[in-house]
Amino acid sequence: MVLFKCDGREMPRMNLSADNVRDSIPLFRNGGGGSIPTSAHQLLFVKTNVHRACELNALWHSRFPKIHWSNVVRNKDYICFVAEHDMMAYASAIWSSPIARNFENANTALELRRLAISKDAPKNTASRILGWMRRYLLKHFHHINLLISYQDTECHKGTIYKASGWNIASRSKGHKWTCRTRKRNKDQSISDKIRWQLCLR
């Protein structure tokens, strides 16, 4: 049996269906779900374990569905969130220390590695969870001064970041991660990227 830590306790992790991954109480509802929210204001934003966050990302992320939990927890800082209504998930977010080795001030920055929204999430879910996470990180991560995230220019226009007060920090050409000395998994995208950032302090 595989275990994961939740609020400091080791809990059993089961093989669940897609509906059950979304459900915080699958054993009681058996994936039946709850009422569907009609407004993003009805969503409750809470921390979640990295396994569930990665599984939700695999369900919903249009461009980067693959992210292994071990690539998250090996970082100095990491935290995952979920947006729920009636104990059903509608969005997930995965943060960690910046993955770029040469990133300046890496010890005082957090990177939004993934933000995935379900198709049935209410309008403005992304902007609501971005705002809530900013306030949470400002309050609980006292050593973090900067938030960053990378936009895939082939699929997204950065509207959500712009509307949430983030600024463009840099633009870069897409490239493969695999090199002669280090073989990687198949790239999910090699399109150009824009790095957005938000100063917390």
Regions found by a protein language model. Name each.
Residues 72-82, 87, 142:
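A short helix-loop-beta-strand connector motif used in the catalytic cores of GNAT acetyltransferases and
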Residues 71-72, 149:
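A short acidic/basic microdomain associated with nuclease active sites
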Residues 78, 191-196:
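Short hydrophobic/aromatic beta-strand or adjacent loop that forms the aromatic wall/cage
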Residues 197-201:
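Short beta-strand-to-coil "C-cap" segments at the C-terminal boundary of structured domains/repeats
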Residues 25-70:
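Short amphipathic alpha-helix that is part of the acyltransferase structural core
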Residues 1-38:
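Charged, low-complexity intrinsically disordered segments and flexible loops
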Residues 49, 53, 61, 65-66, ...:
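Extended mixed-charge, aromatic/glycine-enriched low-complexity segments
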Residues 44-47, 85, 91-192:
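Acyl-donor binding region in acyl/amide transferases
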